[in-house]
Regions:
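Catalytic cores of carbohydrate-active enzymes across secretory and cytosolic contexts
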Residues: 1-203
Length: 203
């Protein structure tokens, strides 16, 4: 565990008539070589790199909002890769219920095998939990074993989750119903019809 410097790139909405976009990079001379490579590949197969990317996405993204003096009423996690943000927000707000008021989660992967799980000790060693003790992490998340299940933790931290179609919502509810303490999983259909979602400037 050591500090990693992060640079935020900003894409102005006027460039492509899009929403504002922030991109995070660790490829900076202030970082050692290993830290510089955290953002070199998307979905890196190396577990330590992947955990570092998840810290950057979740904790880094939430910290960026604070650095920019934004005060989001809601944090939306599109898949569970950024759930480390919940531990940053727990530290910021002081309790899980305050985090739950501000967190929603979209789940995509309907297969149990596709849910990310990593060694909880490794995550603790890498600073994933923002300095929280492991027994506190276990109590907060309900994770009793050695494997940290990102999607399950996201479902326990969020006030609401959604699947990406009616059928997927049903499949997701069946997949997770055996677990205690999860939020409601609704369904929002991903629309591909431009009449529903595209800005007029795009067509």
């Amino acid at each position: 565990e050591h500090p990693v410097w992060v640079k935020a790139w900003y894409l102005n909405p006027e460039t492509f008539k899009s929403a504002p976009l922030f991109l995070l990079s660790t490829d900076l001379p202030e970082n050692d070589y290993v830290s510089q490579t955290i953002t070199h590949r998307l979905y890196d197969a190396n577990v330590a790199t992947k955990v570092a990317q998840f810290i950057l996405l979740g904790v880094g993204g939430a910290k960026l909002m604070d650095e920019l003096n934004f005060n989001p009423g809601l944090y939306h996690l599109n898949e569970a890769h950024g759930i480390s943000a919940a531990f940053y927000l727990d530290k910021k707000y002081g309790n899980k219920e305050e985090v739950k008021k501000r967190l929603v989660f979209t789940t995509h992967t309907p297969e149990e095998a596709g849910k990310e799980k990593h060694d909880i000790q490794k995550k603790k060693k890498m600073g994933y939990f923002c300095g929280m003790k492991l027994d506190e992490v276990r109590e907060l998340t309900g994770m009793a074993g050695d494997q940290f299940n990102h999607s399950l933790v996201a479902l326990r931290f969020a006030k609401l989750a959604n699947g990406v179609s009616q059928l997927h919502g049903e499949v997701s509810r069946n997949l997770w119903k055996k677990f205690e303490g999860i939020c409601e999983i609704k369904a929002i259909t991903n629309a591909q019809n431009w009449h529903y979602w595209a800005d007029k400037q795009l067509y």
